[in-house]
Each structure stands twice: as C-alpha cells, then as structure tokens.
Amino acid sequence: AGDIALESVNQSLVDAAVNQFGRLDIAVNNAGIAHQPAPVHQMTEDIIDRQFAVNVKGVMFGMKYQIPVMLAQKQGHIMNVSSLAGLGGAPKGAAYAAAKHAVAGVTRTAAVEYGRKNVRVNAICPFYSPTNILNVDGYNTPEAQAQLGMGSPMKRLADPQEIVNTMLLLLSPGNSYMNGQTIAVDGGVTAW
C-alpha cells in the first residue's frame, strides 16, 4: 500500500475502501514502528522524525480522510492503535513513547471535535505481543519473549487475537457511547 507516513497513501487507502464498499463505517489506524533501544540523550533526529512520521502523521493523515466520509454518512468509528508506552514511559524508547502519547492525544481531541456528529474515536494501548515490532527491539526469540511476558501480572505476552477481540468489543454497536478513550490491553500491567 505504501508509506503510511505519506498523506497521499492515506487518501488512496480511504478512497479505495469507499470505492469498494460504498461507505466507511469503521477505520482502524494500526501502522506503527519501534526503534532500536537508546536512552533519551542518544536519540537521533532520524529516529525521532521517523517515529513521528509513521506513528503520528500516519494516524493523523488517516483520520484526515476518514472523518469527512464519516461526517457525510452521519456516523462512524475510528480505532487508533497506540501502545502501553503511550500511557506511561518506555525506558530506552522515548521517541516511540512520545509518538504513542501523541496518538492518545489526537484520539481524545478528535473525539471531542466529532462526537456530537456521531463520529467516535477511541484507541487501544496493547502490551507486547509476538508481532514484527518485537524484531526491532531484538526480542525475536521465544526466550526473550517469555522474559518480556514476565512483566505482565498474567506472566505472558498478549496474543494478537486478544487485541483484535478487544477492538471488536469496542467497535461493536452495543458500545456506542464510548468515545475518546484509550484502553489498555495489558494483562493488568497498568494495575500495578
């Protein structure tokens, strides 16, 4: 599909969805990248720029084109994927954490701006799950992932399907009053 950090790619994705389905009831902004671990004083301009380009601009450009379609339909729901790092700190991951905090902020802002027009915007903040993002951090072995999982009260990583199930629950018609929320899917990490 292309580089999600580019506005034109986001516009093309929304146009393609509307052309194929005739409308856009739900949109999920789930592109994200991590960076090699480094403390704040070692962050480079390239690391910071790329984190914000993909993790923030990708979400904002997606919403820029999703929202007008939903406003014309008089309804819609946008689900942004932030991260547990977007609710707290991330040692040696400051650029990633800052970008994911920005996703939570734009989620809340858009929820306030468009809620009265029946366009809801929420975000989920998942704990680690065995996906490609762990390869960037060097946690691509079963042993390393098991160690990461020990950071959760459930003593394991999130299964990707558990994250999807949470999204489906939040996107369901019976959940139509939830708006502007960032929900942790973390096995209880934020309860500590």
Features from the language model and the residues they span:
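C-terminal substrate-recognition "lid" of short-chain dehydrogenase/reductases
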Residues: 60-63, 156-185, 190
